[in-house]
Amino acid sequence: MQNQVIQLGNIEIGNNKPFVLFGGMNVLESRDMAMQVCEKYVEVTQKLGVPYIFKASFDKANRSSIHSYRGPGMEEGLKIFQELKETFGVKVITDVHEIYQCRPVAEVVDIIQLPAFLARQTDLVEAMARTGAVINVKKPQFLSPGQIGNIVEKIAECGNNKVILCDRGTNFGYDNLVVDMLGFNIMKKVSQGCPVIFDVTHSLQCRDPFGAASGGRRDQVTELARSGMAIGLAGLFLESHPNPNQAKCDGPSALPLSKLEPFIAQMKAIDDLVKSFEEIDTSN
């Protein structure tokens, strides 16, 4: 199978390369907390030898309730991202929701993310592609893995071939998600080998049908992440929080920051083992 590799500074993102950790927090809650979380991730990934990219949102524009916290906004968020880059030397990924956000965000961060709920909005996809930035496409919960190729084609038609694909679970009836482990390789094939990563924490979301915010199953984050890493992926997408029960968004799915090192150590061990195997072609 063809494997494309995206070079981001000294980080190689590819399905046959050592996995890259896209990690941080769901939404920027404060400058100080962002610094705390990023510092911990940098400490752990440097110790374990894992390539690392910081992730967080400056605006959670798709919150269920009008009363839910959304974030500091683009202007303040970009200031925080710039400080993180200067302080820790990290690459940064964040999402955009509006066409006008694409260029200013791409001037600061290293990867711009297409949210799952917006992944079929052609005007937004084209605006993101034309920045020339690396784009992380979140596969919509309602879309089959094979359909992701159409989104990749839209980006390519704008002259951008720097695409990462991310699975964050698939609708399973109402208010629940499951992860189709067979879908990862389908996404690789229909995209001609784009790097594929796994958003394990969002895949753990589940809802109270009448609630205003998502619930989650963080007690299962390790077993689900182990399963995904056994496929052989370009990266793992992970959200953590110093105190998940007090997080302003998606705390029930977040890995406690104190558990980061043993968690990532296990993921690296699985990735190293799986990618040491010779590929077996069972198609004929």
From Swiss-Prot:
It holds the Pfam family DAHP_synth_1. Keywords: Cytoplasm, Lipopolysaccharide biosynthesis, Transferase. Its EC number is 2.5.1.55. InterPro entries: Aldolase_TIM, DAHP1/KDSA, KDO8P_synthase. It catalyses: D-arabinose 5-phosphate + phosphoenolpyruvate + H2O = 3-deoxy-alpha-D-manno-2-octulosonate-8-phosphate + phosphate. It is an enzyme of class 2 (transferase). It comes from the Bacteria. GO terms for cellular component: cytoplasm. Pathway: Carbohydrate biosynthesis; 3-deoxy-D-manno-octulosonate biosynthesis; 3-deoxy-D-manno-octulosonate from D-ribulose 5-phosphate: step 2/3; Bacterial outer membrane biogenesis; lipopolysaccharide biosynthesis. One of its GO terms (biological process) is keto-3-deoxy-D-manno-octulosonic acid biosynthetic process. GO terms for molecular function: 3-deoxy-8-phosphooctulonate synthase activity. It is found in: Cytoplasm. HAMAP family: KDO8P_synth. NCBIfam families: KDO8P_synth (TIGR01362), PRK05198.1 (NF003543), PRK12457.1 (NF009109). Belongs to the KdsA family. This is 2-dehydro-3-deoxyphosphooctonate aldolase. The gene is kdsA.
